[in-house]
């Protein structure tokens, strides 16, 4: 090949912009510029995942396959990825538990259920509402058909020996033969029964936090001089660029970790139920599910089995050892444990981790109507948007505390300026 031919081929592949395109993708996905020329082996695990995602996006591929691409991404990066994929001109196949992400990116939804694969036009929310409507219609049609069947059978039973009614009886027998009561195919999609019921209504004093500060062992400031009061009815989402900040805060207010400075106090009427990020210690045991759950609430074996049944553990499954459960099964056990507390304040550290979409939907729906207080962190945009009525962001220089919806928070220019200031961005 001649040099001119190589240059032509290089230009066709957009080679002159290769380095700047790569830098744009890396920066968009949250890899800082000073890490762009660092060896992969020197990056953290989360940074490596972002580089791999940038590699998949690079080169404008004809077909892009993404498996849970939003895992461990912060809100700015997820928003950037949503916008990038929404404007992507080629085919994208994506698997995700992030409903807002699916709604923002997808034009079609592939449903794998009833042993079949079906494609629907529309995003996730449109598919979900349509599928629920179709199911309700099927159930109504079946109920009407069963009622009609009972009416016909009752008429035939009463008048089969009545000569004067013989023609009517014969007519109804024919109608009964033609009546088809279609069985509704059982779905592989199961929704757990998640219901949090506070045993006691909370008073006006929920939680008071004064001057709370915490650093890591390496000296990294997670949050500093945090002051706020939680009011009755508050459902607070905690945000931070450093996920360890939220976890440390929750561990402190649950008495599992000491702050470097400051105090906190719970109201006398408050009972809490805590869902920690790391539940490993809860499952380092040989207990089966029934015995494990019995540690956390009152009730006999039959009651506990029924409770586990609502959380989608049935039959012999309830006798499995908890140590062999999957991540999603362990999360459902932890949620069951919380429900037994009948607490009026829930503390949830990234509660949708390991859960499937059905469990997330059930969890989300109950928290929207929950009558107590909620303090939580989450990567799930839809979960935050529909549950939280207050936002507190923990930064190294204090907090941002706003009574507003999440969508407004992440799009507000004022908040963007405030966040940059609080994090010391240049």
Q: Model-derived features: where do they sit?
A:
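ABC ATP-binding cassette signature C-motif
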Residues: 1-142, 199-426
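Short hinge/gating elements
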Residues: 8, 158-159, 192-195, 291
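Short amphipathic coiled-coil heptad-repeat segments
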Residues: 23-29, 154-158, 174-179
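Short, surface-exposed loop/turn segments at secondary-structure junctions
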Residues: 37-38, 162-166
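ABC ATPase nucleotide-binding domains
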Residues: 138-158, 165-174, 190, 413-426
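Proline-centered turn/helix-capping motifs that create local helix->coil transitions or kinks
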Residues: 164-168, 178-188, 265
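ABC-family P-loop ATPase nucleotide-binding domain
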Residues: 184-206
């Amino acid at each position: 090949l001649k040099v001119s031919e190589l240059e032509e081929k290089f230009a066709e592949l957009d080679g002159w912009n290769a380095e700047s395109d790569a830098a744009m993708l890396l920066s968009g996905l949250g890899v800082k510029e000073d890490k762009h020329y660092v060896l992969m082996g020197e990056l953290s695990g989360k940074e490596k995942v972002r580089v791999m995602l940038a590699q998949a996006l690079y080169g404008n591929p004809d077909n892009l396959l993404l498996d849970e691409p939003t895992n461990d991404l912060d809100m700015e990066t997820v928003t950037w990825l949503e916008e990038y994929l929404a404007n992507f001109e080629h085919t994208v196949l994506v698997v995700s538990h992030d409903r807002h992400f699916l709604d923002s990116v997808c034009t079609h939804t592939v449903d794998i259920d009833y042993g079949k694969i079906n494609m629907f036009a529309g995003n996730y929310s449109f598919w979900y509402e349509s599928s629920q409507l179709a199911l309700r219609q099927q159930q109504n049609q079946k109920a009407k058909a069963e009622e009609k069947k009972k009416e016909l059978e009752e008429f035939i039973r009463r008048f089969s020996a009545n000569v004067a009614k013989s023609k009517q009886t014969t007519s109804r027998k024919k109608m009964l033969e033609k009546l088809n009561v279609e069985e509704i195919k059982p779905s592989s999609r199961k929704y757990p029964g998640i219901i949090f019921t506070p045993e006691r209504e909370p008073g006006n004093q929920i939680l008071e936090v004064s001057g709370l500060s915490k650093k890591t062992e390496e000296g990294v400031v997670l949050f500093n001089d945090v002051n706020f009061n939680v009011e009755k009815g508050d459902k607070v989402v905690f945000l931070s660029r450093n996920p360890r900040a939220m976890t440390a805060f929750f561990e402190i207010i649950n008495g599992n970790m000491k702050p470097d400075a400051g105090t906190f106090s719970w109201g006398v009427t408050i009972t809490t139920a805590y869902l920690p990020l790391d539940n490993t210690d809860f499952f380092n045991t040989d207990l089966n599910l029934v015995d494990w759950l019995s540690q956390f609430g009152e009730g006999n074996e039959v009651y506990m089995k029924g409770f586990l049944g609502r959380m989608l553990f049935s039959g012999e499954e309830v006798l499995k050892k908890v140590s062999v459960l999957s991540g999603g099964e362990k999360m459902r056990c932890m949620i069951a444990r919380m429900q037994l507390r009948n607490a009026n304040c829930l503390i949830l550290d990234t509660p949708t981790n390991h859960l499937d979409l059905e469990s997330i939907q059930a969890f989300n729906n109950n928290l929207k109507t929950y009558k107590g207080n909620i303090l939580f962190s989450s990567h799930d945009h839809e979960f935050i948007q529909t549950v939280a009525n207050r936002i507190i962001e923990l930064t190294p220089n204090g907090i941002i505390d706003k009574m507003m919806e999440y969508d407004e928070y992440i799009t507000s220019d004022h908040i963007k300026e405030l966040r940059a200031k609080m994090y010391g961005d240049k």
